[in-house]
Structures are given as C-alpha cells and as structure tokens.
Amino acid sequence: IESVKKRVINSERNLACLLSGGLDSSLISAIVAKWVPKGQLQTFSIGMMGGSDLKYAKMVSEHINSNHTEIILSEQEFFDAIPEVIYNIESYDTTTVRASVGNYLVAKYISEHSDAKVIFNGDGSDELTGGYMYFHNCPNNMEFDYECKRLLNDIQYFDVLRSDRTISCHGLEARTPFLDRTFVNNYLSLPIEFRNHNNNKNSNNKIEKWLLRQSIQENDPELLPNNVLWRSKEAFSDGVSSHNKSWYEIIQDRLNSQYSENDFKSKCEKYNHNKPTTVEQLYYRELFDSHFHNKDKIIPYFWMPKYSNVTDSSARKLDIYKEKNKMSKTNLTIDVNC
C-alpha cells in the first residue's frame, strides 16, 4: 500500500491504471483508487472480442468505481502492430513481443484520448512472488527462491523492458509499485516456505501468489471482488484473446505460409545467438535486424517456462494451465479460508 501511495501523492501529473482484470493490475488499481477522488480514477483495458480478461477488468472497475475504458480491437489490428512494437521495444523475444502488443496499443490509445501521463501497472509481481504458472512444478523451496531472484535479476530484459518502452514511447510515464525496493526487500526477507505456494498443504486447490492473496483477504477483504482476488493466473499475452483462439495461435496462423520449408531453414542458419526455431521467432528476428543489425545479444536468451517440456512460451500450453481451466469449467472453487 505504501509503495502505491507514495507514487500517487508525489505525482504532479494526471494518472491512470492499466487494468487487465488479473490479480496484480486489479490490486494496484484498487489501492490507487483509495488515493484518488471517488469516480475520478481512469482505468484502461484492452483485448480482442471474447478476450478472457475483459469481463474481470470491468468487474474490478465497477467495484472500485473507476472511469473505465475498454478497448476492443480486431485480430488483424493486433497483428499489424507487431513491426512497430518490435522497433519500439528493441526486442525479438517471443514472449516479450506477444505481451508488448497489447501494452503498446493501450498506451497509444491513452496518449491520444486521455490527459493521463502517469500510468500505473501491476508488473513485477510474478517475478517477485513466483506467480507464473510454471512455478506449480517447482521441485523445492530452494529452487523456488532461486528462480524468483533469477527472474528479478533479468527483468530488465523482459517484463520491465516491455512495460517501460511500450508506455514511454507514447510520451507516458510508467509506475511499477511491485518493484519498489523496500517492498521487494521486505517480501524476499520472508521465509521461503511461506512464499512458496506449493507448501500450502491444507489447500484443496493450490493457487499461485497464495501469500499475497491471503494477506489481502485477511487485512482488506473488501478491496477486490472475491472471484478476482482468487482468480488463477492468466498471462496478459494470453488474456487479450479468447480461450477458443489464443493470441499466439493467431500470430502463428498468419505466419505459417510466409516461409517455405527450405527458406525457413536457410534463414535460421545465419543466426548463431538465439537461433530461431519457429516461423514466429524468425519473423520477429528479421524485423529486429532491419532496425538493429548485429545487436541480437541485447537479449541474452528466449524467455521460457521452466520445469516442463513445452516448446512454446504461452502459459496455455502448460499442463497445469489446462488442468486449472478444466476445473474452472466444472465449477470447482478454491478454499479461500485454507
């Protein structure tokens, strides 16, 4: 709360919140709303028709009484933005590019249709708390702690790069309270066995970021709607699209006919660092090279989920995601009192 408060009261420019409907952006928006005159906080969400995040963002905006704008764009509008996104973020990492498109387009909208200049977001929480879905497969406490700190150490190559550049390229200023130095140090000082949600033996349905959720439940139970507070993780790059056709599938469908098999192989061979293995990666790399030739080592590696054998970085490819999605469809709920 303090990391949000000081960024609100010290801001001399009009502010707004990116509100995806996930736990992190919803939590930040709800806390910001406490320090803004009632009904004056601007929140923005973006997605394609049927995007899984949109209904939750609307639910939160009504709960916190924000002035909410929902931006719905077509699959083609998302896809067409990729070249300018890669130019502005200066990255070809698969996950970063996918997630940056929504960020870039919503920031562009804000810059053109709003007087807000300071933009709050929920980035950094997944790295700090072990909130990515693949952490469910983390083998032990020591590895959990190591992986969180590894992600934080490398965050400037991925999520923070995405958030900062997609927002700042439109003349806006990003605010990321989850990465407040004091908050990060305090959170990491907690015993690993508390931070690792896989240790929650009493839960019938383990959920990522359990400690963060439970602390809200106990200290400010009215802060968020219960089904948002206990909503399982949905990556922003997936949540902008529907479950019927994910954003990564939309991209790949449009690119599959772009290269012949021989053309694809020959073009991939010229790269030694982070060699492309898919047409999507090759497409991003060629766009990157057209602006930043011989600068490929600026990205040390491709971001990928650990503790699994998936070959695509989308969380929707993970078995744990499929299991949780199946459970939600059968109306199984999480025991919030565990």
Locate predicted features:
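A short alpha-helix-loop-beta-strand transition element characteristic
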Residues: E222-S232
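Surface/interface-facing alpha-helical segments and adjacent flexible terminal/loop regions used
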Residues: Q258-K265
